[in-house]
Amino acid sequence: MRIDIVSIFPEFFGVLDISLLGRARQSGLIDLRLHDLRAFTHDRHRTVDDTPYGGGAGMVMRPEPWGEAMDEVLADDTDPVVIFPSPAGEVFTQAMAQELSAEPHLAFGCGRYEGIDQRVVDHTATRARVRLVSLGDYVLNGGEVAVMAMIEAIGRLVPGVVGNPASLVEESHSDGLLEHPSYTKPPEWRGLAVPDVLRSGNHGAIAAWRREQQLERTRRVRPDLLPD
């Protein structure tokens, strides 16, 4: 999978050089390409923002550097999905992560300030498949944190990135429910014991217990995930 990121803070994504995604990059499973938005400016101040038409607080990111950055991202004509993090977008879910993990090319545009000039989104939509995506009903200082979260969720679903694919099946949201509690050794710690069923060796009973724990936890914490 190829992933392009456009940002005024490309160094923010240095963390992608470590852990599972770092190994995925080294092995060629993920081809990450960072684009510094300021590299597409042509004034000595490397300006990427300006005051909004119509007035209002804050600054808006100018279309010119964004247009040139997207020209570079889209130059290979690979028909990527271009994602702009936005509180006005559709909410990112595990199902969306699974869907996007099958795409050969994703591109992310990290907005800042009061956002990106809408013409950038509109023009990009004439050249690629554009999606506005939100992490939830709150506002961040910029798109970098949201993009990091999405890449982490999507990248680990790319075949070969996670060593044991079975672990992906057992996680929260993989089947629409929250994950069951997990335990390891020792069998007792500070007066708290591992549930007997998990030490019984009865795989049917263990599966039933885990399923019930998923349902109970989902009913208690995220009842909105359960069917009506």
UniProtKB/Swiss-Prot annotation:
Residues that coordinate or bind S-adenosyl-L-methionine: 111, 135-140
Main location: cytoplasm
GO biological process entries: tRNA N1-guanine methylation
Subcellular location(s) per record: Cytoplasm
Catalysis performed (reactions): guanosine(37) in tRNA + S-adenosyl-L-methionine = N(1)-methylguanosine(37) in tRNA + S-adenosyl-L-homocysteine + H(+)
Gene3D superfamilies (alphabetical): 3.40.1280.10, tRNA(m1g37)methyltransferase, domain 2
Entry keyword set: Cytoplasm, Methyltransferase, S-adenosyl-L-methionine, Transferase, tRNA processing
Cysteine pairings via disulfide bonds: none
A GO cellular-component term linked to this record: cytosol
Source domain of life: Bacteria
Enzyme Commission number, as recorded: 2.1.1.228
Enzyme class, spelled out: transferase
InterPro entries: Alpha/beta_knot_MTases (IPR029028), tRNA_m1G_MeTrfase_C_sf (IPR023148), tRNA_m1G_MeTrfase_TrmD (IPR002649), tRNA_m1G_MTases_N (IPR029026), tRNA_MeTrfase_TRMD/TRM10 (IPR016009)
Record family assignment: Belongs to the RNA methyltransferase TrmD family.
HAMAP family membership: TrmD (MF_00605)
Quaternary structure note: Homodimer.
Function: Specifically methylates guanosine-37 in various tRNAs.
Name of this chain's protein: tRNA (guanine-N(1)-)-methyltransferase
Taxonomic source organism: Clavibacter sepedonicus
